[in-house]
């Protein structure tokens, strides 16, 4: 006995949602080849009944950080070294000619220098001025020369022409330590004891004694 043929359902008869598993299998090559009516397959495609599963692949994100462009670096066009009396810098020589040749604002430098050295009247303060290509400048104050500090401490006006025979003054060990402490940043040493010996040597060459003395005279040895 022949079985009755069942007609394939038309697209209009499908009203309920199709399960995900069934939708995934409808577009496989095997399922499409079994359809007796190719028009049904086109209906499935046109009505978007196939629901593709969400992608599980990971997308790689590349983050590019843009570093800020650095500003234009200033170029040093000159370094000027001067020794000026504290609080008394003026546009007169040597300041005016030295800075004017580099295009530096002379009055601005004098004002800044005098303000920073106002607490050291009577001292000669060395200064190192760095000039840039945009006419701006910076400067560093050095400590006064050791000879100036020794004359101030001893009360002498100038050093001796013959320091071995003629003495012009005397300082205490505490005064020597104070001068060495002030000069330490500019000396080629790291300890206060070494700085004191360096300053003591300068004092000896100027005819200034130290009480008590810290430098021991070397004895001459006679070799027969």
Curated annotation (Swiss-Prot):
Pfam families: Ribosomal_L11 (PF00298), Ribosomal_L11_N (PF03946)
Keywords assigned: Chloroplast, Methylation, Plastid, Ribonucleoprotein, Ribosomal protein, RNA-binding, rRNA-binding, Transit peptide
Principal localisation: plastid
Transit peptide: 1-66
Subcellular location: Plastid, Chloroplast
Positions bearing N6,N6,N6-trimethyllysine: 75, 111
Record's GO cellular component terms: chloroplast; cytosolic large ribosomal subunit
Keyword DNA repair: no
GO MF assignments: large ribosomal subunit rRNA binding; structural constituent of ribosome
Gene3D superfamilies: Ribosomal protein L11, C-terminal domain, Ribosomal protein L11/L12, N-terminal domain
GO biological process, alphabetically ordered: translation
Entry annotated with the keyword Chloroplast: yes
Subunit structure: Component of the chloroplast large ribosomal subunit (LSU). Mature 70S chloroplast ribosomes of higher plants consist of a small (30S) and a large (50S) subunit. The 30S small subunit contains 1 molecule of ribosomal RNA (16S rRNA) and 24 different proteins. The 50S large subunit contains 3 rRNA molecules (23S, 5S and 4.5S rRNA) and 33 different proteins.
PANTHER family: 60S RIBOSOMAL PROTEIN L12, LARGE RIBOSOMAL SUBUNIT PROTEIN UL11M
Role description: Component of the chloroplast ribosome (chloro-ribosome), a dedicated translation machinery responsible for the synthesis of chloroplast genome-encoded proteins, including proteins of the transcription and translation machinery and components of the photosynthetic apparatus.
Protein name per Swiss-Prot or TrEMBL: Large ribosomal subunit protein uL11c
């Amino acid at each position: 006995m022949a079985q009755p043929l069942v007609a394939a359902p038309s697209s209009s008869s499908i009203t309920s949602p199709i399960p995900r598993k069934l939708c995934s299998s409808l577009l496989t090559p095997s399922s499409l080849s079994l359809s007796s009516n190719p028009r049904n397959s086109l209906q499935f495609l046109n009505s978007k009944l196939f629901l593709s599963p969400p992608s599980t692949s990971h997308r790689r994100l590349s983050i590019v950080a843009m570093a800020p462009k650095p500003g234009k670096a200033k170029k040093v066009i000159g370094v000027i070294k001067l020794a000026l009396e504290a609080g008394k810098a003026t546009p007169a020589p040597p300041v005016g000619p030295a800075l004017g040749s580099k295009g530096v604002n002379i009055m601005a430098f004098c004002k800044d220098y005098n303000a920073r050295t106002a607490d050291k009247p009577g001292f000669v303060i060395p200064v190192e001025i760095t000039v840039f290509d945009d006419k701006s400048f910076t400067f560093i104050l050095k400590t006064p020369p050791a000879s100036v500090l020794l004359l101030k401490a001893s009360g002498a006006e100038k050093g001796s022409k013959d320091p071995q025979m003629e003495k012009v003054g005397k300082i205490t060990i505490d005064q020597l330590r104070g001068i060495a402490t002030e000069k330490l940043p500019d000396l080629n040493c790291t300890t206060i004891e070494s700085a004191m010996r360096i300053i003591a040597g300068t004092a000896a060459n100027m005819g200034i004694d130290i009480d008590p003395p810290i430098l021991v005279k070397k004895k001459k040895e006679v070799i027969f």
